[in-house]
Amino acid sequence: MADRTVFDSPSRQSTSSPSNNNPASINHRSSFAENLRHSPRAQRHPSFTQAAVQELLNHPPVPKIGDPRFAGRDWRQIHVGELVQETDIHWCELDTDVERATKALIESGPPNVILIRETPDDVTACDSFDYNDLNAYLLVVLGLANPDEEQKETYSQLASKAREHVPIPLRDVITLAKKEPLTTLSESEDLSKAVEIFGSGVHRILVCKPGTTTVVGILSQLKLVKFLWDNGSSFPAIDQLYPTILRDLNIGAQQAIAINGDKPLTEALQLMSNEGLTSIAVVDNAANVVGNISTADTKLLTHTSSLPLLQSSCIHFISVILSERGIGDGKDSFPVFHVNPYSTLAHTVAKLVATRSHRMWVVESASPSPSAPATPSLGYASVVQQPSGGGSVPPSPSFPAVSAAALPGARISGRLTGVITLSDILNLFARTTGLNPMDPNESRARRRRSSSASVRPSMDSSRGDYLDTIREMNQNNLKNIFQYRGLSMRTNNSSELEVEYKKTREIMTRPGAKFQTLLQDLLPDGGKQGMRELKWVNQDFSPPK
C-alpha cells in the first residue's frame, strides 16, 4: 500500500537494470550514480554547466514584453474567449476505447485533456479524460486500486477485460478517478471570473459560446498564469506583487505529500490516485527533495515493454523521465521544481511557467547569501506535525537509500517544508484585486476527505513507521547533545538518565547563553541550524529506554 508522507520535492535519478549474465549482479541494486553513467544522458554534453543552472535558478527569466493587444487594459475586463483557441479541443466519444483515447491524450499535448461527448456530432462535453483518469485505470488493471465493497466486481471485470485485450469504452473508465465536475464559462465573461474560480482550486474551465454549451476552448490555470506573467507590465496591480518573497505573501501550504525515492513506483501512482493529486515530491531519508513524479508521466507506462518500470523505484523512474525528456528535447534535462520561502513570487512564477508545472515544492535553503535565497527559520517539525501525517518507511537492504547529496545538482535543493500551487497564486491575485475566491486549502481538504476509507489503515500504519524513523533520528541528535554536555546515555541508573534527559529537554527548549556559545563553537554555521534542530528534536521524542 502506498505510504503517505507529508512533505515536498524537485527531480533527478537513474535507470538501467542489472545484467542477467552476471549472477553476482542479480542481487546487487545499482546506485543512482552507477546507473547514470550508462544512461543515454551520459552520452550527451549537458546544455548548461551546473554554475549556469544555478545562475538560472537565482535569476530566472524576466517576463516577456506584453502583447500590445492588452496594453493599458484592465486585466479583469479582458474576456476569457480572448485567451483560448478551438485547436486546443480534442474529442472522443463515450464508446471510444481507452487505448485510442490514451493515444489521443498523449499526442494532443497541452492542455492535457480529452473532452468526451456522447456522439461525434455533439459539441457539448459530458465528461473529460486526462492523466489522472489514465493513472486510475492503470491501477485497476494492475489490481492496485482500492475499491469499495460494491465496486470490487466492476474493478475485477475491468482488469479481466484488459488482460484479455477486450476493448474497454471510456464510459466504463471515467468514473474511476477522483475529479472535479466540469466547470464552464461563457467566452464573453471577464478574466476576473476565471481568476476567482481558479483561485478557489478549480484546475480547468471549458469556455463556451454565450448562452450555449458549445465548447470553443479550454482555459487552464497554467495558461492564465502564463498570460498574466507574460503581460505583467500591462497589469500593475499584479505586477507589483512579483518582487515580494513568498514568506511575506503567506501563501501556499505548510504540508505536502511526498514519497521516499526508494519506494516502488506503484506506491507513488497509488498515492496520487488516492489523494487526487497530479504530482508528488520524491524525497530522500532526510526529506530532501530529489525528484518529482506527475500523473502525466504515466504516458511512459502505456506500452507493454514499459511494464518492468512498475516494479522499479521512484528514483529509477525519475531517471527514465529525464532520459526520455532529454532524448525528446535533444538536450540534457535539468528540472527545477523547488523554491524556498525567500524566493520572490516572480522567481516562483517563472519556474512554474518554464517547467509547465502546477506546483513548486518549498524547501529550506542551504545558506543565506545576496545571490541565493536565505535559509528560512522553519523547523522540520512543521512538516512532521501536520494533521494528515505520512509514512516514509526505512528502506530494506535490497532498496538502499539514495542520499540527495550524492545526486547531481542535489545541493541546490533542500529539505521539504511545503508546497505552492497555481491555485495559491491565482487566489492571491484574486484577493489582491478585490475578488472573493474560496480558500484553495478547503478544496485540498475535501479531496483528502474523499479518499477511500479502505486506504486509511495503511495510511495510519505508515505514519507510525515514519514516526519511528523520526524518533531514531531524534535519538541520535539527543545523543550528540548529551555529548556536548559531557554526559553519557550509557548508564544503568534509569532515574539518573531521566533527570539528565529532562535537563537536556530544558536546554533544547530554552537554550541559555552558555549552551549557545558551545554550539557556536562546535557547529559550522555558528549554531543557527543547530538551535533549530534542537527545538525540532523536542517536538516528537520519548525518553530513551
UniProtKB/Swiss-Prot annotation:
Annotated localization: Cytoplasm; Nucleus
A GO CC annotation given for this chain: cytoplasm
Protein name as catalogued: Protein sds23
PROSITE patterns attached to this UniProt entry: CBS (PS51371)
Ranges for domain CBS: 83-154, 177-234, 252-309, 366-438
InterPro entries cross-referenced by the UniProt entry: AMPK_gamma/SDS23_families, CBS_dom, CBS_dom_sf, Ssd23
Family: Belongs to the SDS23 family.
UniProt keyword Cytoplasm, yes or no: yes
Native organism: Sclerotinia sclerotiorum (strain ATCC 18683 / 1980 / Ss-1)
GO MF annotation, one: protein serine/threonine phosphatase inhibitor activity
UniProt KW keywords: CBS domain, Cytoplasm, Nucleus, Repeat
Described purpose of this protein according to its UniProt entry: Involved in DNA replication and cell separation.
Gene from which the chain derives: sds23
Source taxonomy: Eukaryota, Fungi, Dikarya, Ascomycota, Pezizomycotina
